[in-house]
Amino acid sequence: MLSVETHAAAPWPDALDWAARAAEAVAAAFAITPFAALADAAPLVEVAVRLTDDAEVHTLNRDFRGRDKPTNVLSFPQVQNDLLESLANSDDGEILLGDIVLARETCAREADEKGVSLAAHATHLIVHGALHLVGYDHMDDVSAAAMEALEVKALASLGIANPYADQD
């Protein structure tokens, strides 16, 4: 069973149910991967989503990635890629798959630049982060294209337009 725990540490707009949005985004991301069974697996599979500010993400990005600046989203997988396939068959009671952390100011700025709502952009970033938790990456053009295609498919299932449509 999939559990998404969301914690808002910074002033994210209250008009949206961020916990429900995060849960939908993570579930949509997993549903279009070979790891869809994790959502209904016997062990509790938990993903933590933290909505925070640029200052906290800057610190995390510096400390864990060696990049001394904020970024829009960070993912911290807790399960090695080679163990992911066996999780659905695990008899462990609970598995922490990992953490996704979003920076409000960066997300809001990027949403404005793209002409989309903060909710749509944050949902995209949560989908992106969830895909990282199950082993997807964008270190080269081929893996980036594959990951973007999955993001587009997951977002479409949530009624969100292709965020890459205007890119050449």
Swiss-Prot record:
Cofactor annotation comment: Binds 1 zinc ion.
Residues that bind Zn(2+): 128, 132, 138
EC number: 3.1.-.-
The UniProt record lists the keyword Ribonucleoprotein: no
Subcellular location: Cytoplasm
GO MF, one example: metalloendopeptidase activity
Similarity field: Belongs to the endoribonuclease YbeY family.
Function: Single strand-specific metallo-endoribonuclease involved in late-stage 70S ribosome quality control and in maturation of the 3' terminus of the 16S rRNA.
HAMAP family tied to this protein: Endoribonucl_YbeY
Name of the protein this chain belongs to: Endoribonuclease YbeY
Source organism of this protein record: Sphingopyxis alaskensis (strain DSM 13593 / LMG 18877 / RB2256) (Sphingomonas alaskensis)
Lineage, highest ranks first: Bacteria, Pseudomonadati, Pseudomonadota, Alphaproteobacteria, Sphingomonadales
